[in-house]
C-alpha cells in the first residue's frame, strides 16, 4: 500500500497510538505538513508514521499505519516584543491530524519528491508477529 509518511514522530506518541484510541497530533515540521497536505480524511485514507528522521528513512524501517480521521491546517501569527518595542513578527504553519491505529508496518520503498514535495512510502502491513 502506498501512503504519505510522517517522520520524526515521538516514540511515546507511536506507543500511545498502538493502544487503539484516536489521538490528535499537532505537526510543525514543514516536511510533515507538506506530506499530509494532499491527504483526504476517511476510512480508506492511511498514513505511515515512524520515529525515524526523514533523511534516514529507508526500506526495512518499521513504523505504524494509521487511519486519518480529520486534518486541519492553520497559520499562526506570532509577535515577539523586546523592552516594550516591536521586535519581530512571523507566521508559523501547523497542522493538527486526528488518527487511529491500523497496523504495524514495514517500509518497502521510499518516494521523495524533492524538498518541497511530499514523502510517500510503499508499506507492507505486518500480518505475523515474532517474539524476541
Where are these regions (language model features)?
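Short beta-strand-centered aromatic/proline hotspots
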Residues: 59-74
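Hydrophobic beta-strand residues in large extracellular and virion-surface proteins
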Residues: 47-49, 66-68, 97-101
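Compositionally biased, charged N-terminal/linker segments
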Residues: 1-41
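Short, surface-exposed beta-edge/turn micro-motifs
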Residues: 1-2, 43-46, 94
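Amphipathic alpha-helical interaction segments
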Residues: 54-55, 71, 75-79
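Short coil-to-beta transition motif at edge beta-strands of beta-rich domains
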Residues: 34-58
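Contiguous surface segments at macromolecular interaction interfaces
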Residues: 77-132
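Generic structural signal for buried aliphatic residues
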Residues: 23, 45-47, 63
Amino acid at each position: 500500500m502506498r501512503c504519505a509518511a510522517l517522520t520524526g514522530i515521538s516514540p511515546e506518541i507511536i506507543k500511545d497510538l498502538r493502544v487503539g484510541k484516536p489521538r490528535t497530533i499537532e505537526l510543525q515540521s514543514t516536511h510533515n505538513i507538506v506530506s499530509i497536505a494532499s491527504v483526504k480524511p476517511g476510512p480508506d485514507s492511511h498514513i505511515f508514521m515512524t520515529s525515524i528522521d526523514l533523511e534516514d528513512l529507508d526500506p526495512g524501517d518499521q513504523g505504524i499505519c494509521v487511519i486519518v480521521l480529520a486534518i486541519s491546517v492553520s497559520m499562526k501569527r506570532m509577535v515577539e516584543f523586546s523592552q516594550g518595542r516591536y521586535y519581530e513578527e512571523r507566521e508559523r504553519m501547523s497542522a493538527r491530524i486526528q488518527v487511529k491505529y491500523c497496523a504495524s508496518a514495514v517500509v518497502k520503498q521510499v518516494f521523495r519528491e524533492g524538498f518541497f514535495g511530499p514523502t510517500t512510502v510503499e508499506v507492507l502491513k505486518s500480518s505475523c508477529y515474532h517474539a524476541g
